[in-house]
């Protein structure tokens, strides 16, 4: 089960690994008061997953960042569809974006592949289940999207 505690722990670890001193390039080149509005846009068709983790990546980086989800967890989306809108201090948005994208891409990919398997066994007695064979430290988020 993906709890808020699990999400916070995973996101904080990812931020500490990716940007332990902040995002130095942004801090050196972007004014502190600059704001940014951007969107998480799908490159291909899929199933949305990881919205809570995306939100946490931005909000834990800077509480002034707002994330508006445009796709609900577990819903199908099409290429080019906006899945979320992110707005806030540019430095914070840019610091968190790689972490948020990494989680979103991986979680959406797992949810999309799982949906394909579920569709493939529809009408049979087969069931699709998850496994414990996952990425160390990221088991909960990987299993939550199956």
Name each region found by the language model.
Residues 2-146:
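Acidic/glycine-rich phosphate/pyrophosphate-binding loops and surrounding catalytic core
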């Amino acid at each position: 089960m993906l709890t808020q505690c699990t999400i916070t722990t995973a996101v904080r670890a990812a931020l500490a690994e990716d940007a332990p001193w902040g995002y130095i390039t942004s801090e050196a080149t972007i004014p502190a008061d600059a704001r940014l509005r951007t969107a998480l846009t799908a490159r291909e068709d899929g199933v949305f997953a990881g919205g809570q983790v995306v939100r946490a990546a931005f909000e834990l980086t800077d509480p002034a960042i707002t994330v508006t989800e445009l796709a609900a967890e577990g819903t199908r989306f099409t290429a080019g569809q906006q899945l979320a809108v992110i707005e806030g201090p540019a430095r914070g948005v840019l610091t968190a974006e790689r972490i948020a994208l990494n989680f979103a891409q991986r979680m959406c990919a797992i949810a999309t592949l799982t949906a394909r398997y579920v569709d493939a066994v529809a009408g049979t007695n087969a069931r699709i289940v998850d496994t414990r064979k996952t990425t160390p430290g990221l088991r909960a988020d990987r299993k939550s999207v199956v």
